């Protein structure tokens, strides 16, 4: 590092370094999304089909979430049932 660079302050980031940072953010986001199992959407669809045999509900009335807490996985199922 040159003494003059120190007094000039921080130089602008190059477009390559900005692109690299953005790509790292995107990759980290994609890896985070990959943690959910692939079968979750199919499970939700099948649950809606089974519940529809008995109750009139829409596709958005069933929410399925999978949570990992240490060595334990928790499957949370929320069903909004219509009024009678």
From Swiss-Prot:
One GO process term, biological-process aspect: regulation of division septum assembly
SUPFAM superfamilies attached to this UniProt entry: Cell division protein MinE topological specificity domain
InterPro entries registered for this protein in UniProt: MinE, MinE_sf
Keywords per UniProt: Cell cycle, Cell division
Pfam families, alphabetized: MinE
Gene3D superfamilies noted in UniProt: Cell division topological specificity factor MinE
NCBIfam families from the UniProt entry: minE, PRK00296.1, PRK13989.1
Task performed by this protein: Prevents the cell division inhibition by proteins MinC and MinD at internal division sites while permitting inhibition at polar sites. This ensures cell division at the proper site by restricting the formation of a division septum at the midpoint of the long axis of the cell.
Family: Belongs to the MinE family.
Record's protein name: Cell division topological specificity factor
Organism: Pseudomonas entomophila (strain L48)
């Amino acid at each position: 590092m040159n003494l003059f660079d120190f007094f000039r302050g921080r130089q602008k980031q190059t477009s390559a370094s900005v692109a690299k940072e953005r790509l790292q953010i995107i990759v980290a986001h994609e890896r985070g999304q990959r943690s959910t199992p692939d079968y979750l959407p199919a499970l939700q669809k099948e649950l809606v089909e089974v519940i529809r045999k008995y109750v009139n509900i829409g596709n958005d009335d069933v929410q399925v979430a999978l949570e990992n807490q240490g060595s334990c996985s928790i499957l949370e199922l929320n069903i909004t049932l219509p009024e009678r």
